[in-house]
Design a protein with these regions (language model features):
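Short, flexible helix-loop junctions that flank or precede catalytic/ligand sites
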Residues: 1-167, 171
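Positively charged, low-complexity/disordered segments
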Residues: 168-180
Length: 180
């Protein structure tokens, strides 16, 4: 799995989406990925609402809709700065998604999050946002879907003998995910 992510991070253009439900750690994963990508020669610019973590060596832009700085307008401005990598806190609307896809096709690496429950639903969600399927196929280079596993209360949890079905299910969960 690490090798697949390393291969993905070795690409210089395309869209990498981190997806999952609210509170699943998408932002943490996104920050980890862009930190891995950052080097002295990399021009990394982020668009965030809000800026959650400081990234040394990156230019981070806070969205401020009161003064007209939206994800879409910020992304248009960022493209004039010739970034190598663009991190967008979340693809929320058609205009931002469309600009992000175009940026990736013209040689930029775009990393963003999207609220969907699976990798497959990411494609449907982008289509629902008005992105043509051929553009999705041309731009999306990877989708990382995740969700957090709940922790049991140490005082309330009770040991239970695993059934054959639960063991099979657990081994399926531990098999490598598809990242292509």
């Amino acid at each position: 799995e690490d090798a697949k992510i390393d291969k993905l991070l070795g690409l210089t253009s395309g869209v990498i989406m981190i997806v999952g439900p609210t509170g699943s750690g998408k932002s943490s994963t996104m920050y980890t990925l862009v930190r891995e990508l950052l080097s002295d020669r990399t021009n990394l610019i982020t668009l965030e609402d809000p800026v959650e973590y400081h990234i040394k060596g990156a230019t981070q832009v806070q969205i401020n809709e009161k003064v007209g700085l939206t994800f879409a307008s910020g992304l248009r401005s960022i493209l004039r700065q010739d970034p190598d990598i663009i991190m967008i806190g979340e693809l929320r609307d058609q205009e931002t998604a469309s600009i992000a896809v175009q940026a990736s096709i013209t040689g930029h690496l775009v990393v963003s999050t999207l609220h969907t429950n699976s990798s497959a639903s990411t494609i449907t969600r982008l289509e629902d946002m008005g992105i043509e399927s051929y553009l999705i196929a041309d731009s999306v280079i990877g989708v990382i879907a995740q969700r957090l596993v709940r922790r049991l209360c140490p005082f309330c949890k009770k040991p239970k003998q695993a059934t054959r079905r639960s063991e099979e299910h657990t081994s399926e969960l531990q098999s490598p995910a598809c990242i292509s």
